[in-house]
Swiss-Prot record:
Family statement: Belongs to the RemA family.
InterPro entries with a match to the protein in the record: RemA-like
Coiled coil: none
Species assigned in the record: Rippkaea orientalis (strain PCC 8801 / RF-1) (Cyanothece sp. (strain PCC 8801))
Record protein name field: Putative regulatory protein PCC8801_0196
Length: 89
């Protein structure tokens, strides 16, 4: 059985590291389109607490999560989480 790895994406919000496909910046037109499409489908999770969106997390279930922390910070937490899991086995 695979253990659940979690990543803090800011303000006490957590996502499953096992479900993350991509962590991207929200500035490009294709990413803005992905956000709009997810909102229309009801699969957008806004975890920014009213702050500016700095990272967009795309999951394998087609959910899109908006975060107010930088993509590099989320990616670093992702890597640290994976390394900690590898060292515990």
């Amino acid at each position: 059985m695979e253990s659940i790895q979690l990543i803090n994406i800011g303000f006490g919000n957590i996502v499953s590291a096992n479900r993350v496909i991509a962590i991207v910046s929200p500035e490009s037109a294709p990413i803005k389109r992905i956000i709009t499409d997810a909102r229309d489908r009801g699969q957008l999770v806004d975890a920014t607490y009213g702050r500016r969106t700095r990272a967009v997390i795309i999951t394998d279930s087609s959910h899109v999560v908006l975060s107010a922390i930088q993509p590099e910070t989320v990616a670093h937490r992702f890597v640290v989480s994976k390394e900690a899991h590898a060292n515990s086995n």
